[in-house]
Amino acid sequence: YGKSKLMIENVLEDYATAYDFNYTALRYFNAAGSFEGLGYQLDPKEHIIPIIVGKALTGEKLTINGNDYETADGTCERDYTHVVDIASAHMAALNYLFDGGTGGSFNIGGGSSSSIDTVVAEVEKQLELTIDKEYGPRRDGVPAKTSANIAKAWDEMGWESSFTIQDIVRDEIAYQQSLIKK
């Protein structure tokens, strides 16, 4: 996945050089959350925040893959990005290009990482319950931590994240609860 994205960025860069073409490539870090009743639906779910919220709402046991990573609490840390922040990054990228920006690749993230255990604790806090959880083995090839350096997005496009992990969890809970009510 990462290699194919890098290949496309390289093609864009070569094309831009050859044909005097400006572009932006946005690198999203862990899209999450929902907006006005629109959310992320996969079956089976593949992203951790919808999984955690779903398990909390159904009372099913949550399995966290690995608690022996080189992080503060032993669980993976990820930089989660609210879908509205991603939308605003697209607008900033368009405005940047329309205003004469030269283009390039930009990291789009929340600017800080949250561990899986931190996300679980936030879901528990907002739902006022305790999630039945267990720790399983690590998944192969999963890095301990990812975090977006969004300095270039701010410096060149004037973009920064507006939503926190608390906002992301709140919106994901509201979205999944709306599905239950239907």
Regions found by a protein language model. Give the residues of each.
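Flexible, glycine-rich beta-alpha linker
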Residues: 21-45, 71-75
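Active-site Tyr-X1-5-Lys
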Residues: 1-32, 51-58
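Short alpha-helix within the catalytic core of nucleotide-sugar-dependent glycosyltransferases
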Residues: 13, 49, 87, 91
